[in-house]
C-alpha cells in the first residue's frame, strides 16, 4: 500500500471490490500545498455519475443473483402515456407485485428505471428477484399484473462486471419536467 492512500474493501458476494483514495494529506515535506482548484460543472457531473454507478453496482451485487429477471415494461402503441401517468402506473404495479410476493411468503427486491426510446415511447426497465414455487413464478405474475402493454423478460446471467448497473444509471435525456 502506498503512503497517502486509504484502502476500502467491499465484499459483494462473489466479488471483492477494492477502492483506493487519497487521504488529503499529501505533498513533500517543506513544500506548500498547491492552491485548491474549483471543479468545473463537467467535473461535478462526471464525479456524480461515477458515484451513482459505483453505488448501484454494489446494490445490484448485494441483492441480486444470476437467474433473476431483467424486465422491460412497454406500453401499447395506441395507449402512450405522460411521464406522470407512467409514474402512477409503476407505483400501482409495484404495490400489487409486493402484495403478490407477500402472499407466497417471498421478499420483493427490485430496481426500476424509466426510459424514453428513440421514437419517444416511454418504457420501464426493472431488475427483479426471481422467485417460483409449484403454483407460479415471477414471470407469470408480471404478465398478469402489467396490463398496459407487453412485458419483455430476460434472465440475468452476469452481474459481476457492473454493465447492468452502468446501464441503469445512465442519465435520462429529454424528460418531461416533473
Task: Name each model-derived stretch.
Residues 36-37, 79-80, 131-137:
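Intrinsically disordered, low-complexity Ser/Thr/Pro/Gly-rich regulatory segments
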Amino acid at each position: 500500500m502506498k503512503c497517502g492512500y486509504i484502502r476500502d474493501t467491499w465484499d459483494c458476494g462473489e466479488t471483492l471490490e477494492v477502492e483506493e483514495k487519497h487521504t488529503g494529506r499529501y505533498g513533500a515535506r517543506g513544500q506548500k500545498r498547491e492552491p485548491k482548484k474549483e471543479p468545473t460543472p463537467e467535473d461535478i457531473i462526471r464525479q456524480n455519475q461515477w458515484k451513482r454507478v459505483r453505488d448501484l453496482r454494489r446494490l445490484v451485487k448485494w441483492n441480486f443473483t444470476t437467474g433473476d429477471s431483467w424486465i422491460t415494461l412497454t406500453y401499447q402503441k395506441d395507449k402512450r402515456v405522460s411521464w406522470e401517468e407512467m409514474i402512477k402506473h409503476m407505483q400501482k404495479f409495484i404495490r400489487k407485485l409486493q402484495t403478490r410476493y407477500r402472499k407466497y411468503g417471498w421478499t420483493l427486491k427490485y430496481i426500476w428505471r424509466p426510459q424514453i426510446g428513440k421514437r419517444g415511447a416511454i418504457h420501464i426497465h426493472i431488475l427483479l428477484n426471481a422467485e417460483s414455487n409449484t403454483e407460479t413464478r415471477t414471470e407469470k405474475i408480471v404478465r398478469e399484473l402489467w396490463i398496459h402493454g407487453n412485458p419483455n423478460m430476460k434472465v440475468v446471467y452476469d452481474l459481476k462486471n457492473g454493465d447492468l448497473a452502468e446501464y441503469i444509471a445512465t442519465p435520462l435525456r429529454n424528460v418531461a419536467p416533473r
